[in-house]
Amino acid sequence: MEGGGGSGDKTTGVLAGFFGAGEAGYSHADLAGVPLTGMNPLCPYLNVDPRYLVQDTDEFILPTGANKTWGRFELAFFTIGGCCMTGAAFGAMNGLRLGLKETQNMAWSKPGNVQILNMVTRQGALWANTLGSLALLYSAFGVIIEKTRGAEDDLNTVAAGTMTGMLYKCTVSEMALDSPFCVLLSGS
């Protein structure tokens, strides 16, 4: 065979490199108990000497006996997602209640069903957005307060909840927009 230059047991042609036609990548053939002759890895980054893969001791991410605790930032994702899902569920129930109330005098037909479905969808999205936004504000305030104070305690939770409530309520009326807290948060 021309250009093959190998023994009869090697595959030749375009795909020869994929099927082990290259040289062995290691100096010792039986380091891991697996014969490595004739192997040619598909990816050069996977060509690792098996001696480096042997572990003498157990390795743990956390020290022995330590409990894994979530920080404020890790809890933020759970809080925001949970509030969005809870808001969607309660909003859907409220939409179903409102839809049934509005269509109780109508004959049971497709337009009535569509109106109920629209109310469920609209109310579910509204409540999910509202609770998700509140959870986002609460989580952001909690992370900022924790990073500023450098402590993780109940005072952060109370302060984050208070600031979230104040910011949420200050956007309700025009008179509240002139409050010092809203002016401070808006930067104007």
UniProtKB/Swiss-Prot annotation:
Pfam families, per the entry: Tim17
Protein name: Mitochondrial import inner membrane translocase subunit Tim23B
Compartment(s): Mitochondrion inner membrane
Protein origin, superkingdom: Eukaryota
Annotated transmembrane regions: 73-93, 125-145
NCBIfam families in the cross-refs: 3a0801s02tim23 (TIGR00983)
Membrane topology: Multi-pass membrane protein
Example of a GO biological process term: protein import into mitochondrial matrix
Reported function: May participate in the translocation of transit peptide-containing proteins across the mitochondrial inner membrane. the PAM complex.
UniProt keyword S-adenosyl-L-methionine present: no
PANTHER family: MITOCHONDRIAL IMPORT INNER MEMBRANE TRANSLOCASE SUBUNIT TIM23B (PTHR15371:SF34), TIM23 (PTHR15371)
Record carries keyword Ribonucleoprotein: no
Keywords assigned: Membrane, Mitochondrion, Mitochondrion inner membrane, Protein transport, Translocation, Transmembrane, Transmembrane helix, Transport
Gene giving rise to this polypeptide: TIMM23B
